[in-house]
């Protein structure tokens, strides 16, 4: 109870508070076929509500016996049905506590004669169990409801300022019909909006209230009228609908004009009915559930600070549009009423309310902010670095998978290969991806030979040779260590023809077509460089194996000019690696070397030239002569105009042009030139010059002569005739 008293009161926050209320009254006896599967309980946290599953009903037990019961997953979901809201009122809490924490701040801060600003509005919506809502709004003989307590406070505050209190009551059926409950009429109530966005219900009556007794009678009358309304459909329950109560507080000025001070909406939302239940077949559930979903969407949009609020989805939300909003002069609260023993319908209602609560939307908002920050930090990385690292790692992993196969590392298989098989493996040794130009190839080859070839051996070409071969290569590794510098020089002179054999042949074939290329795309060039760098590392490992073998077997030396490519390949396959015991380089060193090669290639100017003959071929001239055709003559036959009309039109144009020239002359002539006109003397000329100093374009129409300098129509005609006949 102490935790419950420390809850944050409603109103003033700008959003919509969503609270739960467990009905304190004894529930009516349920029907025999009712399935009360849950018991509502509040956990240690006052804003966390749990639905504890009860023992299964007879139908559920029968289904479980027949093998159709809920599985472990369904049982786990039932045990985890916990929902968080902005506040919860237990069974022992009276209605006075709910009114003091949730409704009273709305009345005190939103007008109602208590110092609020004019035109302020508030909204109180209740949904859930019907008995719990009735006890919350109407109360019981022991404790009053929210209607009575709110009206009592409004009457006391309005008497102090001389304001009047009026009430209206309506019912919404099937989300299409709005009926007046205080004064039933044949026509329905219409929803209208003014230019300021205020909602008005046309045709809804207002009844003045001066005491609590009158208000109690009006509430009873509205309740009876609701029960006796004819159903719009045979499948529609008579009490199925949303009932609303509006309390207006207004005053009148000296002229008798009404000034709205406050408007408070109370809405009893129809209960949510699960359409999956068989007992609910035949009811018009679509419209009732639609209104609840529309209202929850509005509440969620307000609590999650969305720009668009879907008020147009339902008539209920349109009625509450001016009060169920986020502004300084409005406040709202949504109360989910629950019975202590409930069914799946109450669980669905509270699930919708929890989704729309402020605390849940604040958690989602904080999670979205953290996700945005993490995405921004990832976007700050350079794109080239991301692409390069992904490509390099992918190539490295693919090469490691290929080299991990036992068939390629078995010495027996290598020794038994035929020359044809060796020739098949030759493209893997010496072939690289074709680059855009010979400059790129030469730069990569030089940089490849300048690097120590033994350093990249273990990373890309791991071997699992036999123990005998490892012992045999110990002597070879010693020889290679002593003659390291000589080996590097020999590689640059003799092995380069072998490795670059296919590259040069490909470049010769591409020499003719290279002139016609207009340019290389930078992204494709980057990918080719990474691929070439990986192939070069493979070639370098095989080259240093070749030289290690040449030091051990002079008769198989690569310096022999009579040696064929097939014999060289056989020696390379049968050889044993000389650097299997050396440590592999770090991945960061390899990445640094590749980045340096990319920087060197980026300085190469891109060829954007194109030959003239390419342009001429692209722009082929059509030399086929067109078929001769007889020229078409379009004759326009017009009726002859009346000479009088032509003369009138031309004379009108002459008059207009003459008047325009006269006005231009009056706006630019000096004193002597003005005096040369008929009707303008010394006095008028001086007056015109004085006025022209204030506005350069003094005369814009002929009528300005009459208005400014006082010339009559006769003088104006004489002046114009004097211009024509000087």
Swiss-Prot record:
SUPFAM superfamilies in the record: P-loop containing nucleoside triphosphate hydrolases (SSF52540), RuvA domain 2-like (SSF47781)
Disulfide bonds: none
Gene3D superfamilies listed in its UniProt record: AF1531-like domain (1.10.150.280), Kinesin motor domain (3.40.850.10)
Chain intervals for the UniProt region annotation (Disordered): 1-20, 60-82, 402-423
Pfam families with a match to the protein in the record: HHH_3, Kinesin
Family: Belongs to the TRAFAC class myosin-kinesin ATPase superfamily. Kinesin family. KIN-10 subfamily.
Protein name stated in the entry: Kinesin-like protein KIN-10B
Organism ancestry: Eukaryota, Viridiplantae, Streptophyta, Embryophyta, Tracheophyta
């Amino acid at each position: 109870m102490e935790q419950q008293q420390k809850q944050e009161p409603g109103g003033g926050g700008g959003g919509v508070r969503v609270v739960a209320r467990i009905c304190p009254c004894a529930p009516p006896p349920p029907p025999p076929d009712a399935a009360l599967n849950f018991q509502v309980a509040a956990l240690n946290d006052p804003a966390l509500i749990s639905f504890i599953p009860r023992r299964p009903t007879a139908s559920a037990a029968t289904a479980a016996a027949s093998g159709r019961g809920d599985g472990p997953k369904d049982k786990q979901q039932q045990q985890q049905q916990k929902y968080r809201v902005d506040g919860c009122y237990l069974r022992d809490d009276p209605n006075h506590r709910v009114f003091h924490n949730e409704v009273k701040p709305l009345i005190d801060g939103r007008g109602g004669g208590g110092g609020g600003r004019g035109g302020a509005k508030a909204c109180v919506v209740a949904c859930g169990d019907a008995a719990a809502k009735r006890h919350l709004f109407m109360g019981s003989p022991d404790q009053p409801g929210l209607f009575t307590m709110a009206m009592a406070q409004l009457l006391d505050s309005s008497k102090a300022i001389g304001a009047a209190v009026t009430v209206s009551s309506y019912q919404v059926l099937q989300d299409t019909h709005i009926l007046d409950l205080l004064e039933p009429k044949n026509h329905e109530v219409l929803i209208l909006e003014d230019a300021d966005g205020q909602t008005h219900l046309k045709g809804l009556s207002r009844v003045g209230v001066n005491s609590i007794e009158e208000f109690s009678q009006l509430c009873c009358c509205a309740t009876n009228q609701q029960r006796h309304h004819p159903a719009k459909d045979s499948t529609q329950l008579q009490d199925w609908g949303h009932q609303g109560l509006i309390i207006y507080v207004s005053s009148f000025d000296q002229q008798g004009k009404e000034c709205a001070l406050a408007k408070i909406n109370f809405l009893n939302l129809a209960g949510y009915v699960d359409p999956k239940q068989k007992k609910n077949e035949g009811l018009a559930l679509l419209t009732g559930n639609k209104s609840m979903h529309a209202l929850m969407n509005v509440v969620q949009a307000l609590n999650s600070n969305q720009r668009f609020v879907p008020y147009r989805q339902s008539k209920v939300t349109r009625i509450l549009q001016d009060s169920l909003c986020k502004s300084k002069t409005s406040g709202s609260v949504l109360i989910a009423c629950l019975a202590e023993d409930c069914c799946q319908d109450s669980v669905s209602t509270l699930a919708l309310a929890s989704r729309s609560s402020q605390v849940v939307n604040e958690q989602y908002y904080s999670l979205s902010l953290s996700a945005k920050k993490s995405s921004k930090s990832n976007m700050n990385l350079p794109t080239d670095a991301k692409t390069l690292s992904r490509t390099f790692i992918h190539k490295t992993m693919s090469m490691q998978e290929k080299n991990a196969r036992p068939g390629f590392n078995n010495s027996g298989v290598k020794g038994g290969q035929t020359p044809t098989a060796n020739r098949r493996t030759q493209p893997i040794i010496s072939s690289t991806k074709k680059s855009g130009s010979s400059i790129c190839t030469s730069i990569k080859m030089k940089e490849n030979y300048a690097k120590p070839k033994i350093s990249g051996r273990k990373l890309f070409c791991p071997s699992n040779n036999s123990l005998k071969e490892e012992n045999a290569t110990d002597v070879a590794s010693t020889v290679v260590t002593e003659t390291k510098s000589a080996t590097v020089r020999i590689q640059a002179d003799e092995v380069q023809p072998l490795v670059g054999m296919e590259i040069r042949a490909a470049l010769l074939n591409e020499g003719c077509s290279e002139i016609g290329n207009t340019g290389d795309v930078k992204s494709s060039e980057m990918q080719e460089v990474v691929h070439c760098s990986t192939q070069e590392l493979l070639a370098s490992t095989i080259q240093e194996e070749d030289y290690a073998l040449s030091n051990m077997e002079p008769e198989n030396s690569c310096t022999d000019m009579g040696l064929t490519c097939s014999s060289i390949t056989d020696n390379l396959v049968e050889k044993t690696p000389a650097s299997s015991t050396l440590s592999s380089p770090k991945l960061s060193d390899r990445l640094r070397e590749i980045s340096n090669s990319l920087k060197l290639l980026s300085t190469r100017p891109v060829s954007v030239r194109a030959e003239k003959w390419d342009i001429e071929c692209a722009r082929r001239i059509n030399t086929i002569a067109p078929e001769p055709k007889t020229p078409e003559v379009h004759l326009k036959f017009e009726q002859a105009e009346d000479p009088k009309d032509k003369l009138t039109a031309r004379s009108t144009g002459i008059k207009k042009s003459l008047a325009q020239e006269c006005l231009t002359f009056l706006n630019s002539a000096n004193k002597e030139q003005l005096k040369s006109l008929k009707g303008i003397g010394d006095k008028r000329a001086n007056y015109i010059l004085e006025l022209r100093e204030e506005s350069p374009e003094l005369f814009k129409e002929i009528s300005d002569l009459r208005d400014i300098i006082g010339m009559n129509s006769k003088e104006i005609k004489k002046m114009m005739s004097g211009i024509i006949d000087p």
